[in-house]
A protein has these predicted regions:
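Catalytic palm subdomain of template-directed nucleic-acid polymerases
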Residues: 98-115, 193-222
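Active-site palm subdomain of RNA-directed nucleic acid polymerases
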Residues: 46-59, 162-196, 200
Length: 229
């Protein structure tokens, strides 16, 4: 069953949505859940290869062998070096409001294409989100069904990959890698550290920090993310 599912998913036209039909066959709920989980794991493993290639070292969110402690240690090291060489250093800590809920689906598929993700993987990912609807129950009854056009799926193994690519696209458009502003070390210029949506900007002057922050807020707004700092 699983072998057949992988074959249908990766070696046929995903637009035919045959793999989705297979998941709707009248099997038990337990078997259905296990099968769909295996399918998502296969898709996640293939997508992760491209995520690892696209993401820079400053992004530690949802990456194997990396964590918040690494980013804290990096920032502490930068502070120590700034004190050692008697340099000013300015930080801005950015937290996006409901970042994972604000990912625009149409924007996401365009980003995957621009970042060189194979059409097959993009199409399979898009099919997971196709036709999603929700209904809200209130004290006065329930609303009509409505389409869901934003947000990555909570608890889905693909969500970290998709969000990291979405966030990386925003940061690339801010031009952080090319910016001269930042903390100069012997080997490179560092102006940000990230853990998923949590972003730290760091520069040597207040004016540089203001310019970087305004650029980040501008590009984030274009992708429906609201930066809080």
């Amino acid at each position: 069953m699983v072998t057949g599912l992988e074959k249908v998913s990766f070696h046929s036209n995903p637009k035919e949505r045959q793999w989705q039909i297979m998941l709707k066959l009248p099997h038990s709920c337990t078997h259905l859940t296990h099968t769909s989980t295996v399918m998502l794991k296969i898709l996640q493993a293939r997508l992760q290869q491209y995520v690892n290639y696209e993401l820079p070292d400053v992004q530690a969110g949802f990456r194997k062998g990396r964590g918040t402690r690494d980013q804290i240690a990096n920032i502490c090291w930068i502070i120590e070096k700034a004190r050692e060489f008697q340099k000013n250093i300015y930080f801005c800590f950015i937290d996006y409001a409901k970042a994972f809920d604000c990912v625009d689906h149409n924007k996401l598929w365009k980003i995957l294409k621009e970042m060189g993700i194979p059409d097959l993987l993009t199409c399979l990912s898009r099919n997971l989100y196709a036709g999603q609807e929700a209904i809200v129950r209130t004290g006065h009854g329930t609303t009509d069904w409505f389409q869901i056009g934003k947000g990555v799926r909570q608890g889905c193994v693909l969500s970290p990959c998709l969000f990291n690519l979405y966030a990386e696209y925003i940061m690339r458009n801010t031009g952080l890698e090319e910016a001269q502003a930042g903390i100069k070390t012997a080997a490179r210029n560092i102006n940000n550290h990230r853990y998923a949506d949590d972003t730290t900007l760091m520069v040597e002057s207040e004016e540089e920090l203001k310019r970087l922050l305004m650029k980040v807020k501008e590009e984030s707004g274009k992708s429906w993310l609201k930066a809080q700092h």
